[in-house]
Structures are given as structure tokens and as C-alpha cells.
């Protein structure tokens, strides 16, 4: 008898084995063979076995036991993954607590994520939906904009009252607002370098504002050329005087903000272009559209490089993912496609992009492996022989439209907001470790969140993989704008503000 099984279990197992084997013995040899097996296992003749089997063993008993064990094994594996997932959540939760005892040398800032309860709720848009938010890249200044054309400037160190409110900054909804990445010399000014803010509106205009004095915003110039609603703006990362815009007129344009002239204009979609982003070197751009697609283009020529197709509705937002995300996504992509893709192609380092993330009205957040361009000997870039991007992950926890996406400075967390009144925080590390496609944290909101912005660390290379350096430069602010005219702000209590 087995040391593991009781005597009763041991006999039951032997009976089940005989019952199972009986179906595999040819009929002409059944009496002899089964009787022999019966005597070996039970020390009983076949007739006695038949009587016992009918009385004590259900039909197909061994098969039922075996499938039950398999189901139990799968359940144990699922529970182990869940326990690992929850353990990691607790660890990150402890690091993100505002009153944690973690020492200053730890990574408590770079691992900070907003808690369930916000730090403060701001209400200066008179009930008009907040449509755009941006936090200055190195000053403690936040700009919010709303559907009635109002801009509000906030000092993050003193939120008692806004620094300035500009009513009728545009005659229609302001859909996008962006701070310049760094100071630039204005071509029409002998003054020192300027800090600029750009706004794009449904009135078809882009306005450039001087924020040298954040309490006295001044309009420098107006850029005209779009023939329909302006959806999104993005300053060039290496040539800060250049601004990229996209519009309902299906075009993507590059502007010289010093002169107001259009440097480049191209049509890459068959419908409204909703979102635009630029990679770190400024050579490539991503656009998303009402035509359900995402387009990768050369920002030098407007030439299409690749196309991502997989959303089933309007794609509201698209962003390049930092190269630091690769350590999480390479493994996921390799497992999904069984190493069919050239995940480790060194050309990704040359073009300085690899993955992107998008959110759409099909309620999903998608992560894509971007295609590489063909680079000719003259330096021109062309679509590859396989220009279609690969869908790596599709996250479907939102129950309504995904409106906006932000990437955490540590390149591990992704934050998405949706019309289901949810702010979902995704952990790429947990997605890799647990294989559970669910958010690390989900925060419910009273109003419908429509836009969000997370403060960038005050550091030259914001995609640095030096976590200690990033931790020191981290500014722990997350702002979310809502359709009820409020802005919800999360903040980690830090004694020192890191301002250049």
C-alpha cells in the first residue's frame, strides 16, 4: 500500500485502474487478461471485481478523477499567480505611502503612484469640461484649459488661488495645451530666451503664449493654416522652436513658432487625426485617427513608415513608449509570437523607438511593436516590406472610451483614464510576472475624466535608466481633468521641490 494513500484510497485506486483497463483489452482475451490484472491488484477474481465495481465505483471513475486533478492544478497555478501579483502590489503600495519610513536613498519617489484619495480638487472652470492639462517640464506651473476657451495657470506650490485666468483665450474649445520643453530665443525679440506655451482650439487657431511671467500670460502670435478643429500639439524634443499639430482636416503640420510658418504638412489618414507624438530624437512621429489606425511617419519628410491596425473604433491617443519599457515588453512579445519577430534587432536602437501605446473608443489600451523603416544609402526612409505593427497586448479593463494615457517616469507604470469614470494604473512588471491583464490600481472618480498629465522629472535625459538619478529628479504630481469642470490633483509630500 502507498505511504501517501490510506488503505481505502489505495483499494479504490486499484479498482478504478482495472475498470479503466478493461475497455482496452480485446474481447476474446478479456476474461483471462482482466482476471489476471484483478488478481494482481486486488487479489480477487473477476466475478468478485465485477460485483464490487458495480457497487462501489462510478462509471469512468479514473478519467473523472484525472480531469479533476488537472482542474485543481490549473486553479493552484492561477492562485499562485494572483498571490504573486498581490504581493507585488503590497510592496509598491508601501513604497508609495506619503508617510512611509523609507529612507531618502530608496526609490520611493520614482515608484510613487497616486492613492485612492486625491490631494486636492481644483475648480476654476465654472463647470465647463476641462479638455487639456500640462505641467511645465521644470517649473512648478500647471496649465489647464476648458471647452469655453479658458486657460487657467496654477502654481503647484500654492494652489489657494490660480496665478492667472484668461477668459476667451480662444473663441471655442481649447483641445490641447503644451509647454515648450526648454527655453528658446524668439526670432523677433532681443530679450533673453523665452518660455512658451502653445494652445490649439476648435476655432482652427494655434496660439503661442509667453509665460516668462506666469501671472501675466501674453499672446505672442497666432498660427493659421489648419482648415478644421485642432486636436493635439507636441513640441519638437531637439528643436524646441518647432511645433507639431494634427487636425480634423486630416493633416499633420510642423510649424516654426518663431516665424509662424509651416515647415511641413502631410496627410496620413483618411479621417480626423486625433493625437500626435514625437520620438526622443525628433525623427519620427505617431498619429492616431478616427479611421481606427495608428500611423508611424518620418517627421523629416512625412513619409509613412508603418501602420498599426487593431482598434475597432476611434483611436483617441497614441504615445511612443520609452526604450526603458523594452525590458518588460520584449519578453511578452517573444512569448506571444514565439520568437517569430526580430525583437532584438539592433536597428531599434538606431531609430530610438520600439513600442507604442494607444487608447481608443473600443474601450481598450493597446501596446504595439512598431515596424522598422528601410533606410536607403542616401539616408531616406521608406516603409519596410512588412510595414504593419504587431499588437503585443490588449488591455480591456475599461468599460467605456479610453480618453487619455500617461507614461510614468519610471517606464514601468501606465496610467489611463476613461469614460467609465476610472483611472487605471497598469504595471508592466506585473503584467510580465503574473500574466494577469488587469490594472495594478483602479481609482473611481465622480466626474468623467477626459485628460491627464503626470509631471516629468527635472532631468536632461528623461528616459535615463539610472533610477537613483530619476528618483532624485522626480516630481510626484498627477493631474486629471474632468467633464464637470474640475481638476483632481494627486501629490506626494516631498520636502524639497526640484526646480532648475
Curated annotation (Swiss-Prot):
Family matches, as PROSITE patterns: WD_REPEATS_1, WD_REPEATS_2, WD_REPEATS_REGION
Key words, A-Z: Cell cycle, Cell division, Coiled coil, Cytoplasm, Cytoskeleton, Microtubule, Mitosis, Repeat, Transport, WD repeat
Primary site of residence: cytoplasm
WD repeats mapped onto the chain: 125-164, 169-219, 225-265, 268-310, 338-378, 397-436, 459-500
SUPFAM superfamilies referenced in this protein's UniProt entry, alphabetically: Lissencephaly-1 protein (Lis-1, PAF-AH alpha) N-terminal domain, WD40 repeat-like
UniProt gene name: PAC1
Function: Positively regulates the activity of the minus-end directed microtubule motor protein dynein. Plays a central role in positioning the mitotic spindle at the bud neck during cell division. Targets cytoplasmic dynein to microtubule plus ends, thereby promoting dynein-mediated microtubule sliding along the bud cortex and consequently the movement of the mitotic spindle to the bud neck.
GO biological-process terms attached to the record: cell division; establishment of mitotic spindle orientation; microtubule sliding; mRNA splicing, via spliceosome
Protein name (Swiss-Prot/TrEMBL): Nuclear distribution protein PAC1
Assembly behavior: Self-associates. Interacts with NDL1 and dynein.
CDD domains: WD40
GO cellular component: cytoplasm; microtubule; microtubule associated complex; spindle pole; U4/U6 x U5 tri-snRNP complex
Location within or outside the cell: Cytoplasm, Cytoskeleton; Cytoplasm, Cytoskeleton, Spindle pole
Source organism per UniProt: Komagataella phaffii (strain GS115 / ATCC 20864) (Yeast)
SMART domains in UniProt: WD40
Molecular-function annotations in GO: dynein complex binding; U4 snRNA binding; U6 snRNA binding
Domain of life (superkingdom): Eukaryota
Similarity-based family: Belongs to the WD repeat LIS1/nudF family.
Amino acid at each position: 500500500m502507498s505511504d501517501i494513500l490510506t488503505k481505502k484510497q489505495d483499494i479504490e485506486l486499484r479498482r478504478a485502474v482495472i475498470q479503466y483497463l478493461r475497455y482496452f483489452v480485446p474481447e476474446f482475451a478479456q476474461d483471462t487478461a482482466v482476471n489476471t490484472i484483478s488478481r494482481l491488484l486486488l487479489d480477487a477474481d473477476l466475478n468478485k471485481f465485477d460485483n464490487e465495481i458495480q457497487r462501489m465505483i462510478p462509471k469512468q471513475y479514473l478519467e473523472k478523477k484525472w480531469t479533476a486533478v488537472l482542474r485543481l492544478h490549473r486553479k493552484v497555478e492561477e492562485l499562485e499567480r494572483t498571490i504573486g501579483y498581490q504581493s507585488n502590489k503590497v510592496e509598491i503600495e508601501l513604497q508609495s505611502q506619503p508617510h512611509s519610513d523609507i529612507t531618502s536613498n530608496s526609490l520611493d519617489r520614482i515608484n510613487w503612484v497616486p492613492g485612492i484619495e486625491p490631494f486636492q480638487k481644483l475648480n476654476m472652470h465654472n463647470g465647463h469640461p476641462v479638455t487639456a492639462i500640462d505641467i511645465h517640464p521644470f517649473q512648478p506651473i500647471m496649465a489647464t484649459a476648458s471647452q469655453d476657451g479658458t486657460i487657467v495657470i496654477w502654481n503647484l506650490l500654492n494652489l489657494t488661488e490660480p496665478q492667472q485666468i484668461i477668459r476667451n483665450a480662444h473663441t471655442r474649445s481649447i483641445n490641447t495645451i503644451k509647454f515648450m520643453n526648454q527655453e528658446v530665443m524668439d526670432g523677433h525679440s532681443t530679450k533673453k530666451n523665452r518660455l512658451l506655451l502653445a494652445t490649439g482650439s476648435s476655432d482652427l487657431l494655434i496660439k503661442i503664449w509667453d509665460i516668462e511671467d506666469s501671472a501675466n500670460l501674453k499672446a505672442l502670435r497666432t498660427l493659421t493654416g489648419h482648415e478644421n478643429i485642432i486636436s493635439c500639439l507636441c513640441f519638437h524634443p531637439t528643436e524646441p522652436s518647432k511645433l507639431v499639430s494634427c487636425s480634423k482636416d486630416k493633416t499633420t503640420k510642423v510649424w516654426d513658432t518663431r516665424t509662424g510658418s509651416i515647415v511641413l504638412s502631410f496627410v496620413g489618414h483618411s479621417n480626423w487625426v486625433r493625437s500626435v507624438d514625437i520620438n526622443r530624437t525628433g525623427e519620427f512621429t505617431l498619429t492616431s485617427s478616427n479611421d481606427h489606425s495608428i500611423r508611424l511617419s518620418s517627421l523629416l519628410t512625412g513619409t509613412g513608415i508603418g501602420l498599426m491596425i487593431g482598434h475597432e473604433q476611434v483611436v483617441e491617443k497614441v504615445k511612443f513608449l520609452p526604450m526603458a519599457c523594452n525590458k518588460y515588453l520584449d519578453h511578452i512579445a517573444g512569448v506571444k509570437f514565439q520568437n517569430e519577430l526580430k525583437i532584438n534587432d539592433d536597428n531599434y536602437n538606431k531609430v530610438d523607438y520600439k513600442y507604442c501605446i494607444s487608447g481608443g473608443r473600443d474601450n481598450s489600451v493597446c501596446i504595439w511593436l512598431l515596424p522598422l523603416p528601410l533606410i536607403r544609402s542616401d539616408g531616406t526612409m521608406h516603409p519596410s516590406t512588412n510595414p504593419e505593427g504587431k499588437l503585443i497586448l490588449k488591455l480591456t479593463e475599461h468599460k467605456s472610451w479610453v480618453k487619455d494615457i500617461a507614461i510614468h517616469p519610471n517606464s514601468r507604470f501606465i496610467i489611463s483614464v476613461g469614460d467609465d469614470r476610472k483611472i487605471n494604473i497598469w504595471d508592466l512588471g506585473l503584467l510580465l510576472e503574473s500574466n494577469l491583464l488587469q490594472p495594478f490600481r483602479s481609482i473611481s472618480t465622480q466626474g468623467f475624466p477626459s485628460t491627464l498629465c503626470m509631471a516629468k522629472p527635472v532631468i536632461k535625459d528623461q528616459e535615463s535608466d539610472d533610477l537613483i538619478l530619476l528618483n532624485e529628479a522626480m516630481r510626484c504630481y498627477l493631474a486629471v481633468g474632468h467633464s464637470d469642470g474640475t481638476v483632481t490633483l494627486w501629490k506626494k509630500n516631498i520636502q524639497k521641490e526640484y526646480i532648475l
